[in-house]
């Protein structure tokens, strides 16, 4: 039997050293005992594998009728979302024979050459756009790109796929950033794995020294953090 998607993804995060344990200051100012570092996906093999996980999650949600079957382009917000969008569309083609465009934004408008604020598949009225991003902390990137997309064309944003849902409440409410974005914009948000799934899987996965990746000490620190900040 094939291992669950979240378990395989957790192993990938750990082996890529993208999931780190220690003490980290987040954008929110919170001190977290764990951190997801998307910068660790720094070579062709890792980013290709990451794209495969995104594609598998997308296909899973389409099959469950949670996500529109027609996706015209995958949009990744600059900068970290750019390789995600490209890798995801390549994986969708290779694994599922689905030819989908990719689009990303420029941080600054270009006034020469092809110009404009967008790169990749041009946005047109009625297109179904799927957003991809790495880890959502407060939803700031989404709130910035949605108006940008709508300013280009009357597109339908059909959803957002993340690598990890940290499942933390925002500063302003008891909702998580994911729940807050879903409520505000009305499109579904999916994650390849959430933090609870990751820690549950990490307790079972054995590292190179014969010990679980997630020790009792790490699990306790994560549990205490989520007791305080979890949504």
UniProtKB/Swiss-Prot annotation:
Gene Ontology CC terms, in alphabetical order: cytoplasm
Protein name per its UniProtKB record: Orotate phosphoribosyltransferase
Organism this protein belongs to: Bifidobacterium animalis subsp. lactis (strain AD011)
Gene: pyrE
Keywords (A to Z) from UniProt: Glycosyltransferase, Magnesium, Pyrimidine biosynthesis, Transferase
Subunit structure: Homodimer.
Biological function: Catalyzes the transfer of a ribosyl phosphate group from 5-phosphoribose 1-diphosphate to orotate, leading to the formation of orotidine monophosphate (OMP).
GO molecular function: magnesium ion binding; orotate phosphoribosyltransferase activity
Family matches, as HAMAP family: PyrE
Entry EC no(s): 2.4.2.10
Metabolic or biological pathway, per its Swiss-Prot or TrEMBL entry: Pyrimidine metabolism; UMP biosynthesis via de novo pathway; UMP from orotate: step 1/2
Residues the entry annotates as binding 5-phospho-alpha-D-ribose 1-diphosphate: 27, 79-80, 106-107, 110, 112, 133-141
Family, per entry: Belongs to the purine/pyrimidine phosphoribosyltransferase family. PyrE subfamily.
SUPFAM superfamilies on file: PRTase-like (SSF53271)
Cofactor(s) it depends on: Mg(2+)
């Amino acid at each position: 039997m094939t291992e669950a998607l979240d378990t395989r993804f957790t192993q990938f995060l750990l082996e890529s050293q993208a999931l780190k344990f220690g003490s980290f200051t987040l954008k929110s100012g919170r001190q977290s005992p764990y951190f997801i570092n998307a910068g660790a996906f720094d070579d062709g093999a890792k980013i290709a594998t990451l794209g495969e996980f995104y594609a598998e999650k997308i296909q899973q949600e389409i099959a469950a009728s949670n996500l529109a079957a027609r996706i015209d382009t995958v949009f990744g917000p600059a900068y970290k979302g750019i390789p995600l969008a490209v890798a995801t569309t390549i994986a969708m083609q290779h694994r599922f024979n689905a030819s989908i465009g990719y689009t990303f934004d420029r941080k600054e408008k270009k006034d020469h050459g092809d110009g404009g604020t967008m790169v990749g598949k041009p946005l047109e009225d009625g297109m179904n756009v799927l957003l991809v991003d790495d880890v959502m902390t407060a939803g700031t990137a989404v709130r910035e790109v949605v108006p940008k997309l709508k300013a280009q064309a009357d597109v339908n944003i059909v959803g957002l796929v993340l690598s990890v849902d940290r499942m933390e409440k925002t500063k302003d409410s008891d909702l998580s950033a994911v729940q807050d974005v879903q409520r505000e914009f009305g499109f579904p948000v999916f994650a390849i794995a959430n933090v609870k799934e990751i820690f549950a899987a990490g307790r079972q996965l054995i590292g190179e020294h014969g010990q679980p990746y997630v020790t009792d000490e790490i699990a306790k620190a994560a549990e205490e953090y989520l007791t305080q900040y979890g949504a």
